[in-house]
């Protein structure tokens, strides 16, 4: 019986699945909005939310744990300098999954994964203009 096995295999080897989720996590932290299939989005949430919770407390040990999972110094820096303080008062639920129709080629259900409370694009452009 397949009771209490907590992850989807996504038809990949364990190394491929780990690398894919690592790359998707880095993309989500970089762009704060990505489009993927619904099962991948649900698995990505299980990876990203603990990392953001880890980033709420900026210690060397937490940075090393995050780096072990992400393997990207720039994203670890962004995680601890921008995202950790942004979600410091939120007790979880940092991501939002929005269903986004079906992929044309194989009719796979698609989803948008975004970080909640992310700055809107217009606000970011205005902030850059004000900085100049």
Curated annotation (Swiss-Prot):
Part of the 50S ribosomal subunit. Contacts protein L32. It comes from the Bacteria. This is Large ribosomal subunit protein bL17. Pfam families: Ribosomal_L17 (PF01196). Belongs to the bacterial ribosomal protein bL17 family. Keywords: Ribonucleoprotein, Ribosomal protein. One of its GO terms (cellular component) is cytosolic large ribosomal subunit. InterPro entries: Ribosomal_bL17, Ribosomal_bL17_CS, Ribosomal_bL17_sf. HAMAP family: Ribosomal_bL17. Gene3D superfamilies: Ribosomal protein L17 (3.90.1030.10). It comes from Ralstonia nicotianae (strain ATCC BAA-1114 / GMI1000) (Ralstonia solanacearum). One of its GO terms (molecular function) is structural constituent of ribosome. GO terms for biological process: translation.
């Amino acid at each position: 019986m397949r009771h209490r096995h907590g992850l989807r295999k996504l038809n990949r080897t364990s190394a491929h699945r780990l690398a894919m989720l690592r790359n998707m996590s880095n993309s989500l932290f970089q762009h704060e909005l990505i489009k993927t299939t619904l099962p991948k989005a649900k698995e990505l949430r299980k990876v990203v939310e603990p990392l953001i919770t880890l980033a709420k407390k900026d210690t060397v040990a937490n940075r090393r744990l995050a780096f072990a999972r992400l393997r990207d110094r720039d994203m670890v820096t962004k995680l601890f300098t921008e995202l950790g303080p942004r979600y410091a008062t939120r007790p979880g639920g940092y991501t939002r999954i929005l269903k986004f129709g079906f992929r044309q080629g194989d009719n796979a259900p698609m989803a948008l994964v975004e970080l909640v409370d992310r700055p809107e694009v217009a606000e970011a452009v205005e902030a850059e203009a004000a900085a100049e």
